[in-house]
Structures are given as structure tokens and as C-alpha cells.
UniProtKB/Swiss-Prot annotation:
Organism: Escherichia coli (strain K12)
Keywords, alphabetical: Chaperone, Disulfide bond, Periplasm, Signal
GO cellular component entries: outer membrane-bounded periplasmic space
Subunit structure: Homodimer at neutral pH. Dissociates into monomer at pH 4. Changes from a highly ordered form at pH above 3.1 to a highly disordered form at pH below 2.5 that is essential for its chaperone activity.
Disulfide bonds listed in the record: 39-87
Signal peptide: 1-21
InterPro entries, A to Z: HdeA, HdeA/HdeB_sf, HdeA_sf, HNS-dep_expression_A/B
Gene: hdeA
Keyword Transit peptide: no
Subcellular location: Periplasm
Protein name stated in the entry: Acid stress chaperone HdeA
Function: Required for optimal acid stress protection. Exhibits a chaperone-like activity only at pH below 3 by suppressing non-specifically the aggregation of denaturated periplasmic proteins. Important for survival of enteric bacteria in the acidic environment of the host stomach. Also promotes the solubilization at neutral pH of proteins that had aggregated in their presence at acidic pHs. May cooperate with other periplasmic chaperones such as DegP and SurA.
Length: 110
């Protein structure tokens, strides 16, 4: 009985690891450039890396070349939650368009 309980408990403990590995593999298979991302692609990124993705999307022009040598780190921290909220409402929208739209709103309020 103890062996069976140990096997069941061990299996339950491994379930989140297997699930996270599948999610990580799915994210690794997605090799689209940031300019081609949908909001769904952005939301699939780990939450701690979302500000970095916003920074890349804001810095790159349509030819995937950097436009500015300086990034507004404080602005990225401010705009990222708004982009997450906007992307949650429309997951099929173009991520770069959402970034531009939310940046415009933030800059207008400054």
C-alpha cells in the first residue's frame, strides 16, 4: 500500500514538471521575429520576460533594425501591464501595433 501511494504521489509531483517542459518546448518552437508576433505569442512569453519583448518591439522598425540607441526602461515598466491587458482582450491582434498604440497613450498622458 505504501509503495502504491508513493508511486501515485511521485507521479503527481512530476506532473507540473512535464507540463512546464511542454510549455517551454512550445515557446522554443515559436521562432517568429518579434515584429510578426500576435498578442497570443506575446502572452505565451514568461511574465518576467514580457518587458524585454516590449522593449524589442518598441526599438525595432519594420525592417527588424533598431531605431533608437536608447530605450526608455521606466516607460517599458509602465506600459507593459497596459499591453498585457490590451493583448488579453484581443489575442489575434498584431503585438507591435498594440505596443505602438499603448506607447502613444502613455506618451500623451506624460
Amino acid at each position: 500500500m505504501k509503495k502504491v501511494l508513493g508511486v501515485i504521489l511521485g507521479g503527481l509531483l512530476l506532473l507540473p514538471v512535464v507540463s512546464n517542459a511542454a510549455d517551454a518546448q512550445k515557446a522554443a518552437d515559436n521562432k517568429k521575429p518579434v515584429n510578426s508576433w500576435t498578442c497570443e505569442d506575446f502572452l505565451a512569453v514568461d511574465e518576467s520576460f514580457q518587458p524585454t519583448a516590449v522593449g524589442f518591439a518598441e526599438a525595432l522598425n519594420n525592417k527588424d533594425k533598431p531605431e533608437d540607441a536608447v530605450l526608455d526602461v521606466q516607460g517599458i515598466a509602465t506600459v507593459t501591464p497596459a499591453i498585457v491587458q490590451a493583448c488579453t482582450q484581443d489575442k489575434q491582434a498584431n503585438f507591435k501595433d498594440k505596443v505602438k498604440g499603448e506607447w502613444d497613450k502613455i506618451k500623451k498622458d506624460m
